[in-house]
């Protein structure tokens, strides 16, 4: 059950990534194609390795998310920048998290937050500790959750709600296994959206 819930990397992302590599080759931009392919291969390896684990070091999870953001930024013509920040008090090697549990929210920030935005956008992924919880927050300065959805070519219908449902199920399992609260909440900002995912602090033995 847990493994099925973890296997949620969007097949459309993989399809789009391969299309981007093909486009670089066709435009005779081999350096870009090689760089993109290297990052894509690294992400796929991390996803496959991490999907076998119920928890992975925060450092590994953030590396996968960084690769994902890098690829989506390149694929979309660099229409957004991104920042990943971690509270220096957090040991990224010893702190464990469910792999890619925040990826659907990062994806939503890109596909929906950035899709209808005029000009360049920014996405921030931040990690901090709050009492005995780890807070992973995704914030964008995009159009907001209540703006009319702009359909993106290749995007599956109801993908957002499905990803949210899967993530909720994963967090419910974490809560059941750890016996401590785990969940997420949306915060509507004057410009954009913030999602906070709260997890019980889990550290390597």
Region locations from a protein language model:
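Two-component histidine kinase transmitter core
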Residues: 51, 200-205
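Secondary-structure transition/turn motif
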Residues: 140-142, 197-201
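Hydrophobic core positions in the C-terminal catalytic ATP-binding module
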Residues: 82, 123, 193-199
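Two-component histidine phosphotransfer core
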Residues: 1-182
């Amino acid at each position: 059950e847990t493994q099925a819930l973890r296997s949620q990397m969007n097949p459309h992302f993989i399809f789009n990534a391969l299309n981007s590599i093909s486009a670089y080759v066709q435009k005779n931009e081999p350096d870009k194609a090689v760089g993109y392919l290297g990052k894509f291969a690294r992400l796929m390896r991390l996803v496959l390795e991490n999907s076998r684990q119920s928890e992975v070091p925060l450092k590994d999870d953030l590396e996968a998310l960084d690769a994902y953001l890098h690829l989506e930024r390149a694929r979309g013509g660099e229409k957004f920048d991104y920042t990943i920040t971690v509270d220096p008090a957090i040991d990224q090697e010893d702190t464990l998290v469910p792999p890619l549990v925040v990826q659907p929210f990062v994806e939503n920030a890109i596909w929906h937050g950035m899709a209808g935005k005029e000009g360049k956008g920014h996405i921030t992924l931040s990690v901090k500790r709050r009492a005995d919880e780890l807070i992973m927050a995704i914030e964008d300065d995009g159009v907001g959750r209540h703006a009319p959805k702009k359909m993106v070519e290749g995007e599956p219908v109801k993908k957002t709600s499905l990803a949210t449902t899967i993530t909720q199920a994963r967090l419910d399992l974490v809560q059941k296994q750890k016996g401590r609260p785990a969940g997420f909440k949306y915060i509507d900002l004057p410009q954009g959206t913030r999602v906070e995912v709260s997890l019980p602090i889990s550290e390597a033995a």
